């Protein structure tokens, strides 16, 4: 066996190991790549041909919750440390007179850069919704943050064209559905080996929403997908830094550029998804055709497996444990001084993503299980204020962090990587040990938030930036009855100074 054969065999074994039971392409010869002829065209036809009336009422209602959530997070994120930096950048561009609103401010910008700014704001606090995976072979059972790449460009285009609430919902659902099915289909190695799916797959969602609103035909939409595949990017190693929200904001803007070019006659590959040298192969080493071929809207992803709306502005993987910590604190009236130590057992993949074990900034705190549990013990809450730099650097917080042992637990490891198994033990100084276990958090499809609960989260985001109460209530009511909104610019007025 020569070196080439050895290399090919080792790649094939790696692909088999990463596939975990699903049939994905090995990164060997093109002949081994799954055949899904016409896949990109099928996606484009879905975008072009789907009507508002095709979306079930319960799916529309689920979308309203995520849309309201996204608007609130854009408000809160406008007050983040990244907000002024993004606005300074956008202002320096000085592009054109046709401009869309930057939420939480009085600024307007070209659609592309308004989408970027609002996308960064939505993801700035890592508080936005999360797509659940249908397959069992996905780490944590999670895939993307679906709304951040889709809502900003859809909102910007609807505002400028004075589109209706129904137009906004249709574009939003096109984008989310396309993004999520692509994320479901690509081989797990895409995320396992470092890609940030919100940046990569989210770009397709942005293009789908924009193509729908711009009225592109099937061929133009195929080209737009070809362009946006080239634009998308993002890496997990940037988690805990400003560049994670950048990757989300970049996904939001990517679709606007791709669709602008396609509308002008720009060409690209018309089979970028399924081609042996296209997206699925180049960025994932393969894909599962059964996860996407014939599956768009069957069922809608928002319906099944669904999305989670976050209860805290931190990484999703921390939330089951945080829910259990709060439950035990309230049930036992635990005081910080009573705590000897805390053990939190999880699978190895959770420790890989919640990678900041001694955080010193708010951004790092979002990806620190030790911090998330410590701040709950000390303050009994973990909202936007608790993830500011000053909160993380408090002396009592840093001291409590030292008492938290975040470790790989064999029981959690054996439970599988498709869930966020969190095994909690709080050791008190009197010798008592309080125990809890959770796999899902509040806001997940198994324990969903109601519209009113999402509205309360929205109010918290608005209060964080001292948004006027009347405007806050207007947005809540507008989104609740979005099908009756005659002009989306009315919502923009309530979200800007």
Predicted regions and their residues:
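N-terminal secretory signal peptides
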Residues: 1-5, 26-27
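N-terminal core-entry segment
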Residues: 9-19, 24-305, 484, 488, ...
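Conserved acidic/glycine
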Residues: 9-11, 18-19, 424, 435, ...
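Amphipathic alpha-helical segments within well-ordered protein domains
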Residues: 47-48, 154-155, 207-208, 326, ...
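Flexible, glycine/charged-enriched surface loops at secondary-structure junctions
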Residues: 58, 81-83, 266-274, 331-342, ...
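Hydrophobic alpha-helical packing residues
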Residues: 175, 179-182, 228, 325-328, ...
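Membrane-embedded hairpin module used as a gating/binding unit in multi-pass transport
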Residues: 286-330
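Intrinsically disordered, low-complexity Ser/Thr/Pro/Gly-rich interaction regions
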Residues: 315-466, 473
